[in-house]
Every structure is written in structure tokens, then in C-alpha cells.
Amino acid sequence: MYDVIFLLSLQIKLKLSHVSNTISEINGVQLYNSFVAGAQKIFENQALLNNINFYPVPDADTGTNLASTMYSIVNTVKAEENIQATALALADAALMGARGNSGIIFAQFLYGFSKDIKEQQTMNIKEFATYMSVASECAYYALAKPKEGTMISVIKDWANDLVDSCETTDDFTTLLLNALNVAMESLKETGKFIAAKAKTIVDAGAKGFVVFLEGMCEYFHSGEKTVQVANAEIIDSEWLGEDNHEDITFRYCTEALMIGEDLDKNKLTSLIETMGDCLVIAGSPRKMRLHIHTDYPWEVLEKVQTFGRVVYQKVEDMVMQNDLVSNRKSKIGILSDSACDIPKEMLEKYQIQTIPLTVSFGDEFYLDQLTIKPKQFVEKLEKSAEMPRSSQPSLMDFTNRYNYLTTHYDSIVSVHLNGKFSGMINSSRKAATAVSKTTGKKIDVVDSHNATGALGLCVLRTAEAAIGGMEHDELVAKSIEWSEKVKLFVSCVNTKYLINSGRLSTFRAMMLKLFKIKPLFTLDSEGELQLGTFSFRTKDNFKKILGLIKENYEHKKIWNYCIMHVDNPEAAQYLSEVVEKLTGRKPLYIEDACTMLAGKVGPKAVAVAIMEE
């Protein structure tokens, strides 16, 4: 209904406008401004697009993904009078910032539009129609298996009308308005293809493209010389369809951006097309972006690393996203990071969101727990000549995650890795402040002063309380309190990694190595890793851990504990059994340690985290 009203109002305005407003050609600045106007429409309709997202999977993020792609365009490109330069800049910014299936299709659409434009200041109507026709073909080419009744169908119908109509008008506004009318009719048809049981549903990506076109039409009609971007949210409930949460065939939405020389799309397609579905590859022989739904993102990235240099990657859990949309368990969202070492099934149970740290070996980098698994990490750790480096998620990563979560939760509590280990807390707080200001949602960030399983226990207890109905402010206070009630004990085997990570002086490490001593570390009250004691055998370290647990918790009630290990499940199981004898309860879980801990303490290390009631 909204689109019909928009179209009628614009048609009336056009009839009242003067012939002198005719626009027969456009330059780079006008092209840029029309894109900014289209982007603004995406921003305004972000929540709506999320709500009607049912294809290819119902993960409620099409609006977020398109908005992120548009933000990259708006914030990166500087308009030039030369239309070729501006078009190329728009395409490159879209490729760099594209997110999700629809974002990458849009990026390929812009690449197709820009790739054949000659060095020129302006573009006439016929040229515009011709280049947009090429753009439509390129959008189809990006998909391994194009599906009708989706975004690409609307793009094709719109572009075809431009080609048909450019012979009968010399005005850009009239041309775009006529084509918009065709795009709206095409949009109505998409529901027949994507949801036979829900005729009112339209494809979210296609709807996003139509919304973008509306912004372009408004710009050319208004004749404004500049366009200001304002944050806004409009939800048109008339467009919301029935729930139609089809089964998700592959769990992870996986993306990567590669650079190289003579990158071959067909070779890349054959390399990974059997590893999932919804494969989209956009870009040029020098820069390519891929999108695939898969159950094994770590295997996809392992293959892609051999194809070109990966400079960006993203993985999203669509099962978690779908569950959040259809079965939200709390009004407060809980966010942590991949250093929390919580098993996947528990993350699902409590709907805990995590944001990955990045780990790199030289030029190769990976997303902790997503594009590199603990066993892969240990293998690289032992073989690589270079020591791994961990880095925090970017400010944009946090901003995107908070923007997404605020569309589903009343407020958010983030509980993160010790600020002494990473600058993550600062990035999270900056993003939280900015998103809270624009959305009006309360977001609090807690420094747990902990890591690995100690952080995990804090996060799990916070999530459990949120599901139990605890209010936001009390939850934040309790989360801080619980972080002070947990202790971590880490038994190490190899001192090499302790030296490289700066946890031991070279002299002390040499002494430990000479006498084959196994160090035992603890976290102090400030979250610093401290050498507590040592033994000549790992099992003696375990006895000392038991002694420390008894010393600290003999007269206290234990809330729970967990065991972590670096590729040493046998020792972890043994430690679990001896701690169970002391406490009278099994561990909450036994889990592989995150790459951040593994890189610091080395293979075969084992740790226990324990929290008092």
C-alpha cells in the first residue's frame, strides 16, 4: 500500500511540475546524490525489510545487510563531476561493504553498471539504459543458480523497461518513474515464487531494490543539489507476511573478499560450489566477493585462501538468527565474544550472541571458532614459522551487530573478554554508545576481567538471569558481581608460547624448560595472568589446582565450573573427574580453548574455571 501511495503522489507532483525541469543527462554528482537518496530509503525501511525476509532463508537480516552496504557507499564515496569516476567509486565501495545475499547482488549490479562506462563527464538517457541493462546481466551472472521471483527478476524487469522507454522520453525523472512502476508490478509477483502459502509476502531483497528506486525518483523530481542522510526507521506493517520459517539447509552465511591478479570466477565457483548453496560471486578479476551458505565455513575459507588473498570475511549463524526471530527467550539480548569458550549447544539454548576475534598467521587471517577451528589452529601453531596474532573485532563489526540486535531486543548487555588482553571493550562501548543514541535502546558493556571459561561462566549466568526475567539495570550489576566470583587456573606444558606471548621472562622460561617444570597460572583480581606455582608433572599441577579450589571454595557454595583444553581431551577428562570428586558435581561442560588462550599457553594446556554461588 505504501508503494502505491508513493507512486500516485509522485505522479501528481510530476503533472504539476514544469517542462523546464527536464533532465536529459546527468553527471557524477547527480548520480551520487541519487544513490544517497536511495540509500536513505533503505535506512528508513531497514526494520521492514528484516521483518519480511523469508528467502533464501528466514534469518531477518536483509534490511540490516542492505543498510550496511549502503552505509559503505555513503560514507566512502566522494562524488566527482566525472560520471565514470563516480560510478567506479560507487561500485568499489559497494563491493567492499557488501553484506548478505542481497548486498553482494547489489554490488555486482553496480560493478556491471560501471565497468563499461567511458571517460566522460555526463551520461544521457540512452547510455544510462544501456549500462543498466549490462548491470542486470551481471547481477544474474553473480549467482551460481539464479532463481526467478527474487531481487534479480525485479532488476531485470526494471532494466528492460529502461531500454524500452529511453526511445520515447528525454527526461530522466519520467524514465525512472515509468520503470519504477514496472518494478513495483514485478515485486508483487515475487511472492508467488518464494512462499506459496503466504501470498502477501514479497521478496525482501526485491523490496529493498524497489525502495532504493523510490529514493532515486524522489531525488530527480526534487531537483535538490545535495542530499543529507538522516537516520530513520519506518515499519509498514501492511507488508508483513505470515510466519513461513522453512528449514535451513545450510547453517552459516559465509562471505569473503579476495584480491589478486586475474581472479577467475568460474574456477572459484568450481572450487566451492559443492560445499553449500546460495553461492554468489561478485566483482572483477582483481577483486572478488563471495557469499555462500554452508555447514563448514572453516573448510570454505581454507580453500579460498589458496585462490587469492582474503582481506575480509564474515560468518553468520542463520539457525541462531531464525530462532531469535521465531522464538526469542528474553527481552534483553546478551552479547559476548569468541573468547568465552561456551559450547555451541549452550549458545543456542540461551540465545547468546558472540562476535569473533580475529587470529592471523602472517598474511592469512581467520575468524576465531568460525573460519578456523581449535584443531586447525593448533596444527598451524605447531607448523607455522610465525606466531599467531589476535586482534579485536572492528568498530564497524560491533556497530553492525548492535544495529541488528536492537531490531530484536528491548536492550542489550555485553559481557566481554578482559580489557587487559584486548582493546575490544573500548570498541564495543563506542559502538554501543552510538547505536544506543540512534535507536534509543539501552546497551551496557561489562568488562568481565576474565577470559576463556571464566568469561563463559559470567556470560552463561547473565544469560540465564535474563531469560529468568531479571531487569536490565540489575542484570548489569549482577554481571559485574558474578565476574568477581570466578577464578581461572591454567596448567601449561610448553613454555615456548609463554615466552612469545610475554607471559614469562626468557630467563624464567629457560629454567622451567631446563628442569621440565610445568607452570600453573591464575587470573588475579585485575584479570592479569599470573604465575601461581609449578610442578614437575602435569598431574601434580592438577593436585595443586584441587588444593586451590579447596582453599578458595571449601566454605562456599559453588555455582558451577567448566574445563577447557588445547588439543588435550584426555587430560581435560582426567581433570574433570578429579574436580568432580572434590565438588560432588560434574562440570557444566568440557570445551576446546579459544585461539586467544591457545596462542598464549600453547598445546596440551588444560584449564578449569569455577564460580561461587
What are these regions (language model features)?
Residues G100, A107-Y111, H416-T438, L457-L460:
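Short Gly/Thr/Asp-enriched flexible loops that form oxyanion-binding sites at enzyme active sites
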Residues A60-T64, R99-I104, A206-F209, R289, ...:
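Gly/Ser/Thr-rich loops at beta-strand to alpha-helix junctions
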Residues I281-A282, G308-N322:
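Conserved short beta-strand edge segments in small beta-sheet-based binding/regulatory domains
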